[in-house]
Design a protein with these regions (language model features):
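Single conserved hydrophobic/aromatic residue that forms the stacking wall/gate
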Residues: 1-22, 328-346
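Short, well-ordered beta-strand elements within core beta-sheets of diverse protein domains
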Residues: 57-63, 78-84, 169, 279-281, ...
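N-terminal Rossmann-like NAD(P)+-binding subdomain of aldehyde/semialdehyde dehydrogenases
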Residues: 21-155
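Rossmann-like NAD(P) dinucleotide-binding subdomain of oxidoreductase/dehydrogenase enzymes
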Residues: 146-288
Length: 346
C-alpha cells in the first residue's frame, strides 16, 4: 500500500517533481574528478531531455580537453597506489558500494526513468536491477579469481595478472547503469583507475553512481566522471597517451573512429558495437512465439542491442501477430504495463 501511495503521488505531481525531489542535492553541471565535484573549466551547458514529455529535466556541462586531461592525470596518479591494493581491500569497497546501491535503489530507478523515459516499474525490475546484479556478480568473481596462478604443474614459471592502468570508459544511453556497471566495476575490481564518459543524453544515472562510489570510500582519483559528447571527450580519451585502454559500447561507426584514433598510442581497445538479427516465426512455432517476439522488441522501446526489431511471420499467422502488436500501448512511464517514448523518439 505504501508503494502504491508513492506511485499515486508521482502520478499527481508528474515525473518532473519526482526528479527534483530525488536530485536536488546533485549539481549536474559539475564533474567528479579526484574525489570531488568540480566546476568545468569552461561553461558549455547541455539540456537533458525527459523523452516521455520532451521537457528539460536537467542541465549538464560538456567537458573539454582541459577537463578530461585533469581527470586523466588524477587517474594516472591514483593508479600508482590503487594497483597495489589487495584483493580483500577491493572486495570490501565493492561490497560497500553494493550496499549503498541497494539502499539508493529507488533513486537510481527515478534517474533512469527520467533520463530514458521508460516505464518506472519495468525500469526498476530490469534497468536498475542489472546494476545491482553486475556488482554482486563481479564481487563473486573477484573473490574466486587467482591473480598469480601457476604456469604448468611442476613449472617454475609464474603467471601474474596485473591491472592494465588508466581506462577510458564510454557508455551508451539505452542501458545506462547496466553498461556503467559492466565497465566500471571490473575495472575497480582488477585495480585499474578510470574516467567514465556516460552518454550526454542519459547522464543522471552515471552521476548518481559517482555519488555512490564516493560514499563507499574509494580513494580519490580512482574513479572520475566527465560529461560530454563522443566527438569531445570520447575522442580525447581514445587518443590520449596516458590512457592505457578504452572500452566503448555504441555504434559501429563510432567504434571504427575510436579504433583508428587509438592506433597511434597502441592502447587496448574493447568494443561492443551494434547488431541485430531478424526474428522469423513460422506457423508451427511454439504457441507464444509471436507474443514473446513482440515483447522482446517492445521491451525498452526496442532500444536494445539484441532486440529482434524485424519480425518475419508466416502468412497464415500474420493476423495473430498484428493482434498481439495492437495490445501494446504507449503512455506515461509512471503508469504500469505500458511502453513509453524512449530517447530515439526525440
Amino acid at each position: 500500500q505504501a508503494e502504491d501511495g508513492i506511485r499515486d503521488v508521482e502520478r499527481s505531481r508528474g515525473l518532473g517533481d519526482v526528479y527534483k525531489r530525488q536530485f536536488h542535492m546533485l549539481d549536474k553541471t559539475k564533474f567528479y574528478i579526484n574525489g570531488e565535484w568540480v566546476n568545468p573549466s569552461k561553461k558549455n551547458d547541455f539540456d537533458v531531455i525527459n523523452p516521455s514529455n520532451e521537457e528539460v529535466c536537467a542541465k549538464i556541462t560538456l567537458g573539454n580537453l582541459e577537463d578530461t586531461d585533469k581527470a586523466i592525470q588524477s587517474a594516472k596518479k591514483a593508479f600508482e597506489t590503487w594497483k597495489e591494493t589487495s584483493k580483500q581491500e577491493r572486495v570490501a569497497l565493492l561490497e560497500k558500494l553494493l550496499k549503498i546501491y541497494n539502499e539508493r535503489y529507488d533513486e537510481m530507478t527515478d534517474a533512469i526513468t527520467t533520463e530514458l523515459g521508460c516505464p518506472r516499474d519495468w525500469c526498476s525490475a530490469n534497468q536498475t536491477s542489472s546494476g545491482a546484479s553486475h556488482i554482486e556478480d563481479f564481487i563473486k568473481r573477484l573473490k574466486e579469481f587467482n591473480f598469480e596462478p601457476g604456469f604448468d604443474k611442476g613449472s617454475k614459471n609464474q603467471i601474474l595478472y596485473e591491472p592494465i592502468g588508466v581506462c577510458g570508459l564510454i557508455t551508451p544511453w539505452n542501458w545506462p547503469i547496466n553498461q556503467i556497471a559492466l565497465k566500471v566495476v571490473p575495472a575497480l575490481a582488477t585495480g585499474c583507475t578510470m574516467i567514465l564518459k556516460p552518454s550526454e543524453i542519459a547522464p543522471l544515472s552515471g552521476m548518481l553512481f559517482a555519488e555512490m562510489i564516493h560514499e563507499a570510500g574509494f580513494p580519490s582519483g580512482v574513479f572520475n566522471l566527465v560529461n560530454s559528447d563522443g566527438a569531445g571527450v570520447g575522442t580525447i580519451l581514445s587518443g590520449h597517451k596516458d590512457v592505457d585502454m578504452v572500452s566503448f559500447t555504441g555504434s559501429t561507426r563510432a567504434g571504427r573512429l575510436i579504433t583508428k584514433n587509438a592506433a597511434d598510442t597502441i592502447k587496448r581497445v574493447c568494443l561492443e558495437l551494434g547488431g541485430k538479427g531478424g526474428n522469423i516465426v513460422f506457423a508451427d512455432s511454439y504457441p507464444d512465439a509471436v507474443r514473446d517476439g513482440i515483447r522482446n522488441v517492445m521491451s525498452n522501446s526496442g532500444q536494445s542491442c539484441d532486440a529482434p526489431t524485424r519480425m518475419l511471420v508466416e502468412r497464415s499467422i500474420y493476423e495473430r501477430a498484428v493482434k498481439e502488436l495492437s495490445l501494446i500501448h504507449i503512455s506515461e512511464p509512471t503508469r504500469p504495463l505500458y511502453i513509453s517514448y524512449a530517447v530515439f523518439c526525440l
